[in-house]
């Protein structure tokens, strides 16, 4: 029994049946690309990585032939559209067919494609399209990428020369400028030239103009030292550099005796003296002189919107970092930092640092990671890990005028205790009772 090669369900030997029409796979052609059915089937076999061996006399029923014809039409339209879009994209990146922004002064010149170049043999166009259709997809993609990279590597010797359209094949020309696959006329494309308002140079596209502006006219002004001629990237770094001409280093503050481990930390500290307050909160509008102060301030807004609450003691925190520090108090195997003068120990180094201020003038002290066994016994008896942070900061709020406005956490001076208390509460998440 002679059945359809593709579906195997239709009997093609019955000449009296309504489905007696038969299509030879080696000779019948699909209407869109005018390629044989065998070539379409070979392409489908390549998609599933299968070798197709068509026997002479293999035929298709009308239904299967129509399905393959529909598939062929879709593929031809797809390749036509893909060619048009990829060519237009490459043109947009290489000054072809750029559309200017509104309000810009441009020079417009219309591109006209001779009709004689468009009206060519339809079979030649179909051949070119179907060659793309039967190519392996990965090979096709690689070819497109290679073509694009090669064009990107070509240097434009004279940007002011008139743009010359590259040679394209007939299929591309019709897809871009002539008639579409359905016979409708497409609007004529226009190329544009744009002029730099700063130097007057003319470019073929808005893309090239923006590249020119970013490279030639958007450079940050150099800040040059009037003494030695060294260049710094901004005014602040130049101010820090002036330390070298005053007998200091870039790790020392110009306005106070403080010194830091890195120049960037020195610069952050000096912003406190400048008090420019160039960092602004986007939610409430408050301005700060240092970026870390703005960061701590943002944590306050985050705590108001979504506070982090300890499930053990029900205390709320502004950030995950401070919450993680707090959870150490509830752990039995938490890390300890022991005072070298008294038996107290702390989970945080900065609380130990503040605690050590209570021993100033008594002895020369240090920091120990471990305590002797006899001192650990005293620690357990004193229960020093209860509310240790509050006990540690009491030295800051004492009546000592020397330390009354000095933050031991970030080494910042304040005019009075009230400002210091506000700073500790909102910038370092210290609970003051």
Swiss-Prot record:
PANTHER family: C2H2-TYPE DOMAIN-CONTAINING PROTEIN, KRAB AND ZINC FINGER DOMAIN-CONTAINING
Localization annotation: Nucleus
Binding residues annotated for Zn(2+), in chain numbering: 4, 7, 61, 64
Tissue: Predominantly localized to the sub- and supraesophagal ganglia and the ventral nerve cord in the embryo, after dorsal closure.
Domain ZAD: 1-90
Protein name (record): Serendipity locus protein delta
Record-linked Pfam families: zf-C2H2 (PF00096), zf-met (PF12874)
UniProt organism field: Drosophila melanogaster (Fruit fly)
Superkingdom of this protein's organism: Eukaryota
InterPro entries: Znf_C2H2_sf, Znf_C2H2_type
Cellular component, GO annotation: cytosol; nucleus; polytene chromosome interband
SMART domains registered for this protein in UniProt: ZnF_C2H2
Assembly notes: Homodimer (via ZAD domain) in solution. Binds DNA as a homodimer. N-terminal regions of the protein are required, in addition to the zinc fingers, for the specificity of chromatin-binding.
ZnF (C2H2-type) ranges: 194-217, 223-245, 251-273, 279-301, 308-330, 337-359, 405-428
Gene3D superfamilies listed in its UniProt record: Classic Zinc Finger
PROSITE patterns: ZINC_FINGER_C2H2_1 (PS00028), ZINC_FINGER_C2H2_2 (PS50157)
